[in-house]
C-alpha cells in the first residue's frame, strides 16, 4: 500500500512538474526593438521604439508550446531626428494618436534545430492584422543569483504598405523615398517570474 501511495505521489509530482507553466516578462532595460528601412533607394535609416512590453508563457522545456505577446507604443519611435519622428507618428505612417499600439500575438513557436526557432503570429499595425514570421535565435538561460534570465533575438521583414502606411512617393531615378520593406530586430532579455 505504501508503495502504491508513493508511486501515485511520484507520478503526480512528475506530471505536475512537466505541465507547470512558466511565465517570462521582458526586461525593458536590457531589451530593444529596432527597425531598418531603405531611404532614397541608396541608403538606409535605422530607428527604434523606446516603450514596449512583452511576455512568454511555456510549459515545455524546449519552449515549443510558447505563447508570446508583445506590444509597442508607436509614439516612442526614435530615429535621432525630431522632424522625422514627428512624421512617423503622423497619418502618413503610424497615426500614433488614433492607433497608439503595435501588437504581436503568437500562433506558433516552432523549433528548427539547435537554438533556432520560427515564430509565427498576428502583427497588428494601424488596426490591420497580418500573419508574419520571425526568425528567432534562443540565447539560453542563466541564473544571475537574483533570478533566471533568458535571451532571444527575433528578426523579420514586413511590408509596411500592407499595414496601411500611406507615405510612398516615387523618386525620379526609380524606386521610392522610403522603402516598403522594413526589417525588424528585437533583442529580448526575459525574466522568469
Where are these regions (language model features)?
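Bacterial Sec-dependent N-terminal signal peptides
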Residues: 1-23
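Low-complexity, acidic/polar, glycine-enriched regions of mature
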Residues: 20-193
Amino acid at each position: 500500500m505504501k508503495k502504491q501511495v508513493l508511486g501515485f505521489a511520484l507520478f503526480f509530482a512528475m506530471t505536475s512538474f512537466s505541465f507547470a507553466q512558466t511565465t517570462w516578462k521582458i526586461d525593458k532595460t536590457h531589451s530593444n526593438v529596432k527597425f531598418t528601412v531603405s531611404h532614397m533607394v541608396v541608403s538606409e535609416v535605422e530607428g527604434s521604439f523606446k516603450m514596449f512590453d512583452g511576455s512568454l508563457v511555456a510549459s515545455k522545456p524546449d519552449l515549443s508550446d510558447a505563447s508570446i505577446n508583445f506590444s509597442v507604443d508607436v509614439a516612442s519611435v526614435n530615429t535621432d531626428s525630431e522632424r522625422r519622428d514627428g512624421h512617423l507618428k503622423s497619418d502618413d505612417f503610424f497615426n500614433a494618436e488614433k492607433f497608439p499600439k503595435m501588437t504581436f500575438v503568437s500562433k506558433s513557436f516552432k523549433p528548427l534545430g539547435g537554438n533556432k526557432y520560427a515564430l509565427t503570429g498576428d502583427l497588428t499595425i494601424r488596426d490591420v492584422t497580418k500573419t508574419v514570421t520571425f526568425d528567432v535565435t534562443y540565447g539560453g538561460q542563466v541564473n544571475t543569483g537574483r533570478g533566471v534570465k533568458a535571451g532571444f533575438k527575433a528578426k523579420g521583414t514586413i511590408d509596411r504598405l500592407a499595414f496601411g502606411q500611406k507615405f510612398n512617393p516615387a523618386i525620379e531615378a526609380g524606386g521610392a523615398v522610403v522603402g516598403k520593406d522594413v526589417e525588424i530586430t528585437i533583442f529580448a532579455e526575459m525574466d522568469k517570474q
